Design a protein with these regions (language model features):
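Enzymes that bind and transform nitrogen-containing heteroaromatic metabolites
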Residues: 1-244
Length: 244
C-alpha cells in the first residue's frame, strides 16, 4: 500500500452548504464579512499543515486568471518530478491536469506552489514553471491519478498533513476515492439559497453512483467561534467502496 499524507477536508460554507462567499447574507452584527470569514483562516493556520490543496478553477478565480496555451507548443516527453523553490514552511498544491494556469509568482500568501499535472502538457509549459521556480509532479497520463500524486507528496516532498480546501468538484473527487480522513467544517451564519451554486462536495457522476458510499462520519468536536461561526470536526470511517 502506498504511503499517503493525512488529508483533512477543511471547508468554509454557508448554513445551506454553499461555497461562494460573496453571495452569502451579511453578518447579523454589522461586522465586515471579511473579518468574520477570517475565522476559517485562523483555524486553518492552527493545523500547522505541510500544505493545502486547491483545484485549477479556484486558483484562476482568486489568484492567477490568465491561461497558458499549450496547444501551439511541443508535447512533453519526460515526466519526472521537479523541485523548485522550497523556502516556505507550508506549500500550496494545485491540481491543474492540463497545465492551464499562467502563474505570475511562485507563491500564494507566502506559500510555495507545487503544480500537479497530467502528461498532456507542453515542454514549454514545464520550462515556464521551472523559470518561475514552481515545483511540479505528474498524476498519471490524464492528471487524475490522485493516489500517485499524494504518494509523491508524501515520499518526495515529506508531506504528512495536508488540508483539502476545494473547490467543490475537487472535494467530491477526493471523497469518491476515499482519500479524506477528517472533515473540518466551518459554518458561517449566512445563506445563499440559489439552486446550482457550488456546494461542499460535488461529484459529477451518474444517478446510479454513490460517491460517499462506505464512509461514515463520527463527530469528534464542535465549537462555537466568534460572530456566530460554528466549527464541526468529523472523523471519516471508510469501508471498500464497491457500490458503483
Amino acid at each position: 500500500m502506498k504511503r499517503l499524507p493525512k488529508i483533512i477536508s477543511h471547508i468554509n460554507s454557508s448554513v445551506d452548504g454553499r461555497l461562494v462567499a460573496d453571495r452569502w447574507t451579511l453578518p447579523f452584527n454589522g461586522k465586515d464579512i471579511e473579518d468574520v470569514l477570517s475565522v476559517y483562516t485562523e483555524i486553518k493556520d492552527g493545523y500547522s499543515a505541510d500544505a493545502w490543496i486547491l483545484g485549477r478553477n479556484s486558483v484562476q478565480k482568486h489568484f492567477f486568471s490568465e491561461t497558458f496555451d499549450n496547444g501551439t507548443f511541443t508535447s512533453a516527453t519526460t515526466f519526472q518530478t521537479y523541485i523548485g523553490h522550497r523556502d516556505s514552511k507550508r506549500s500550496l498544491v494545485i491540481f491543474d491536469s492540463k497545465g492551464l494556469i499562467r502563474y505570475t509568482d511562485d507563491k500564494v500568501y507566502g506559500d510555495n506552489i507545487i503544480a500537479v499535472l497530467g502528461e498532456n502538457v507542453s515542454e514549454e509549459y514545464l520550462e515556464f514553471l521551472r523559470q518561475t521556480g514552481i515545483s511540479y509532479l505528474f498524476a498519471g497520463a490524464d492528471g487524475y491519478d490522485y493516489e500517485k500524486a499524494l504518494h509523491i507528496l508524501y515520499d518526495e516532498f515529506a508531506m504528512r498533513l495536508v488540508l483539502l480546501d476545494g473547490g467543490g468538484m475537487l472535494n467530491g473527487l477526493f471523497l469518491k476515492k476515499q482519500f479524506i480522513d477528517e472533515l473540518s467544517l466551518v459554518i458561517y451564519s449566512g445563506i445563499d439559497a440559489l439552486s446550482g451554486i457550488s456546494s461542499i462536495y460535488e461529484y459529477k457522476g451518474k444517478d446510479c453512483e454513490y460517491p460517499a458510499y462506505g464512509q461514515s462520519l463520527e463527530l469528534m468536536d464542535m465549537k462555537q467561534c466568534r460572530d456566530g461561526v460554528i466549527w464541526l470536526k468529523y472523523k471519516i470511517h471508510k469501508k471498500d467502496n464497491n457500490h458503483e
